[in-house]
Structure formats: structure tokens, C-alpha cells
Amino acid sequence: MNTNSNSSNIVAASPDAVRVTSSQKIDIARVATRREHDLLGELDVPADAYWGIHTLRAVTNFPITGIPVGHFPELVRALVLVKQAAARANRRLGYLDAAKCDAIERACELIAKENRFHEQFVVDAVQGGAGTSTNMNTNEVVANVALELIGHAKGDYATIHPNDDVNMEQSTNDAYPTALRLALIFATKPLTDAVGDLAFAFKTKAIEFSDVLKIGRTQLQDAVPMTLGQEFEAFSVTLKEDIARINEAAALFREVNLGATAIGTGINADSRYALLAVEELSRLTHEPMVSAANLIEATSDMGAFVLFSGVLKRLAVKLSKISNDLRLLSSGPRAGIAEIRLPAVQAGSSIMPGKVNPVIPEVVNQVAFLVIGHDLTVTMCAEGGQLQLNAFEPTIGYCLLSSLRQLTEAITTLTTRCVNGIEADRERCQSLVENSITLVTALVPTLGYEASSRVAKRALAEKRRVSDIILEEGLLTADQLDELLKIEAMTRPSRAARLVAKP
């Protein structure tokens, strides 16, 4: 084995796995190595690493976020499924012999199905080169796992080569975008499931609070009565809408440019390859993947990413608004609105005893802000593409996969740690309604606008209830007032006010 006394960004995390980090360096002489070469020369690669020289150079070049591709299991799975589909297509075309294809397929299955070797995907998620570093990291890992499966040493590329065999008839410019689209499809399902659970939780609370009358508010001022159930029902409905919008946007990712190779012309690929590779990818993923009608357009266009990112931003905005509402409605406990109580999940202050803060809605707000920022980044990356290729897909992928993960976790946390445990303060809601001047709005059809305005002004000035003044002035009888102030009459379209005659 070769050794090298120079420092490197390579860390032996365990005897059988070498990890790369951007923050730690050790002397490579401490680990056994193998010599690999590329067009720039030779380097020593840790013998235990399943990645090779191309990955090593990428790790050195891009110590950007400290977040490796392996942080996103959906992307790792998608990358190797693309390699497996390509291997199958090339075997059907007679370009890849059965033994090599079988070894590559077995390697891909270990990574995709058994979640092994994900720690070997070590290049930074944000990188130059339009994803070439990620693609080569994948090629090298698949090749070296395949080599070991057939009894050969890592680095024996004369037997199975990362480029000639694993990357056969591919370019980064079609393999990586296809994998990214597939990864986003995989990551979307957990998000929509989480949104569905949250919508159901709000619906459940809407039923529980259907008889709790409260004051609705516009511009933070008292408006007209509604039920707390109606307020929570609105949260449920708006979230359910976004499940359909997200799925519609994600469906665009089923159209891929696999077979386009470098710029969409399909150079170096068999004319039959694209359709066969997409067919095999559909079979492996159980997704109805299709080949883009125009591969040149599909290679350069980022429209699907921009649309999907916008839908995620839409969801984030809704979640942030809902979180704002939960924080406002629970403000107090004695000097705020205090119509609802959020579950107490941790102490709120290091100086104020007994204080409990709405930390779950607060973290959802912050996740929403991150997603909104990611959307702007995706927009700029998409706009920054030039001519036949967009070099910024790695950052598009990083932003979208991060948004999906963060939204999924935030929504799940909001459901389980907050919404499921929300309680209504029924007495507080009733007190606010009874003392609200806005009750007079429900009486306008009966009393008229001018009389109602006079009652409201007097109630405000004298700090008295609207109902007391109406009875005092003889504008309505107690029975008539009770009829008009029934929960049904005040919280949905009703003819009651038209049918009650003035005394």
C-alpha cells in the first residue's frame, strides 16, 4: 500500500469506513491507502474508502456547507437507481456484459434498498460542476462495492470501471438531473403525509370546538362572532388544498432527460438507450417516468424546480400565518387574548419563573422563513443558467431537499407537540363575546345601522354590555335578543334577524 505524509481532509471514522469532513484533518499516513489516477495526476485514496480520486478532489475543492450528499438518503437512493436502470438498459442493448451488470445491480440494491454505504457519499451538497462531483462519487462507490461483491479489490477499475461501466452512455448532465427529480418525488410523499396529518388534527379540534363561540377579528380589531371550531376548520381546509398543489407540481418531475447525455443531443448514446433507460427506471421505482419530448429543452430548463419551490413557499407562508394565529390566540395567560391554551413543552425563561412560551409555533415560523429563503435561491439558480446547461442544480437540489425535510419535520412537530394538545378556554371566549361591542353587528338588520351605531357608541363609552343597553332602551325584548344572539344566527348565514320584528 502507498502512503502519503501530506495532510488531507480524510478521517478514519471506523476501521471499516472512512468519512470525509470539512472541519477535521489528519495525516493520511495514519491510514492505509491505494493509488488512483485521473487526468490531473495521481493521489493516494484511503484503502477502506469506496469512493475514489474524483471524490477526493471534490472534497478538497468544495468544503462549503459541511453537509454531504449522503445527508439526503432520497438523493442517494435516486442516484443509484439511475445507475441500475442504465446498467439494465445497456445490458439489453448488448453493451454491458451480464457479469458486470449483475455486480452493478447488486451494489445498487445494497445502497438503495438496504441503505448501506450512504456514509460513502461524502462530497458537499453544494458544489461547482453541475453535479459532476456527485455523479462521480456515485460512480466510484457503485464500482467499488460491485468489485468487492465479485471478489476484487477496491480500485480494480480494469474489471469494473466507474466511467466506462457504471456511467456507460450517461453524462452528469442527464444522470444527475434525473436523480434529483426522482429524489424530490421520494421526499414529497413524507411531506404530503405530514400535511394530511396536520389537517386532520385541525379538523378534529374543529369538531371539538364547534360549540365554542368567540369573537372573530379583522386587522387585530374585534369583528363579528364565530366559533373556535370554524377558525380551526379554516386551518384544516387551507392545508388540505396544498396537498393537491404539491402533488401536481411534483408530477412534473416524472419527465426526465435521461439519455440526453451532455446537452440533449444524445451524443455517445445508442438511439434506443433513452427510452430503455427510462423504462427500466420506471420499473425500478414504480413511478410512471417518461422521457422528455425535447431533450435539449429538458436539459437546460429549470421550470419544474421553480414551480415546485413556489408551491413549497406557499405552504410555508400558510404554516407561518397559522403559527402566528396560534401564538396570538394563546397569548397571555392573563394579559393577552388567551382563548386557547397550547401544551406546555418546556420552561420558557431563565429569569421569569412560571413563564411558558409558544416554542413549537415559533420554530415553525422559522422553518417557514428558511423555506422562503430557499425559494429565492432556487429562483436565482434557475435564472442564472446559461445556454445549454444550468450549472447550479446542486444548490437547487440542496435547497429543495432541505425545504422538504425541514417542512416535514416542522409539520410533524406542530401536529404532535402542539395542535393535538390544544385546549379551549371556554370561559374566556364566552366573556369576550358577552363584553364585545361587535355583537351589535348581528342586530343591524333588525335595528338599523344608525340605532345600532348609537348602541355601540354608548356601550363603549359606558363600558357596558350591548345587550344591557338594548334592553334598557326597549329596542328588543329579552326573547327577541336571545333569538338574534343564538350561535347559529351569528356564525352562519341566517334569516333570524329579518324575521324578528322590533317591539
How does the language model describe each region?
Residues 2-503:
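Conserved, well-structured ligand/cofactor-binding cores
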